[in-house]
């Protein structure tokens, strides 16, 4: 496993397990399997409604808490709930998280960010981040933060490399964590000839080549799966390295086109939707 150093000197693994769309049962099993395989980064969120399951898996793994990098996200409807950080920690069964995000630039997101800064100062979050903040939202936050975030979690893949956003990220040393990292199941991306060719050269699948591309771009990857073999395969990407020429080949695929298009109406819905947390 490779690690990266954040702008506050904390170290974070380059690859972890994502739990988006996993039921509590699957999140528990996948988290436990991943930790046993050697994963240490686990990513969840209030809105995934599986934080308790992830927390149970961490406890049942028997792995020392300090050797796990736990990431979660505060949902938009919780930004004005002054107890939400403590409630999130309670669901996870931990005293702190290694990375705490606000999930969407919806509702009173500035109050949400102030909550992150407070959690960071109090040691309840070892690092903080923003999820889905791009364009005007990133520009506004840049003028209002008191503590620079360590991470941003956004859509990124070879068809959409976030060139414009990365100019701002590089200025502050903010790291990017990718979602839709394999193209959201787009067979066109997975079937690009360059990945088949490189897979053949290195004895890897196209998915493994794409994951390796992410890490060599400096992106942290959190592929999710409830399949133990896939979880294992996703980790098997650090025994080869793409050459500069090969990275340039992949760079030519960039269309600056995203899969997910969020609307202002959705942001309003996000601010009003309350997750039904596990009991």
Question: Language-model features: where?
Answer:
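Short catalytic-loop micro-motif centered on adjacent basic/acidic residues
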Residues: 40-45, 71-72, 101-102, 127-129, ...
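Acidic-and-aromatic substrate-binding clefts and catalytic sites of carbohydrate-active enzymes
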Residues: 22-25, 45-53, 75-80, 105-110, ...
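A structural motif
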Residues: 39, 94-97, 125, 149
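A short, structured active-site edge motif that brings together acidic residues
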Residues: 65-78, 98-105, 132
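N-terminal binding-site loop/beta-alpha segment at the start of enzyme catalytic domains
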Residues: 1-68, 182, 277-279
């Amino acid at each position: 496993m490779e690690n990266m150093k954040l702008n506050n000197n904390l170290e974070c693994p380059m690859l972890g397990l994502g739990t988006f769309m996993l039921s509590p049962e699957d999140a528990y099993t996948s988290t436990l399997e991943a930790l046993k395989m050697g994963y240490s980064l686990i990513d969840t969120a209030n809105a995934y409604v599986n934080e308790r399951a992830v927390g149970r898996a961490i406890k049942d793994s028997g792995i020392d808490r300090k050797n796990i990098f736990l990431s979660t996200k505060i949902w938009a409807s919780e930004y004005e709930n002054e107890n939400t950080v403590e409630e999130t920690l309670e669901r996870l069964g931990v005293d702190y998280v290694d990375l705490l995000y606000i999930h969407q630039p919806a509702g009173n997101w500035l109050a949400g960010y102030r909550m992150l800064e407070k959690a960071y100062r109090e040691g309840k979050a070892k690092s903080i981040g923003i999820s889905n903040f791009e364009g005007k939202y990133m520009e506004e936050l840049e003028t209002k933060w008191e503590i620079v975030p360590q991470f941003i979690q956004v859509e990124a893949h070879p068809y959409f490399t976030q060139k414009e956003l990365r100019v701002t990220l590089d200025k502050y040393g903010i790291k990017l964590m990718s979602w839709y990292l394999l193209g959201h199941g787009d067979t066109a991306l997975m079937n690009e000839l360059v990945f088949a060719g490189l897979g053949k050269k290195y004895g890897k699948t196209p998915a493994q080549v794409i994951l390796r591309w992410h890490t060599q771009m400096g992106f942290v990857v959190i592929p999710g799966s409830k399949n133990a073999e896939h979880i294992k395969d996703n980790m098997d990407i650090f025994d080869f390295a793409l050459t500069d020429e090969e990275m340039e080949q992949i760079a030519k695929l960039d269309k600056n086109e995203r899969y997910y298009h969020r609307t202002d109406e959705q942001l309003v819905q996000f601010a009003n939707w309350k997750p039904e947390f596990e009991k």
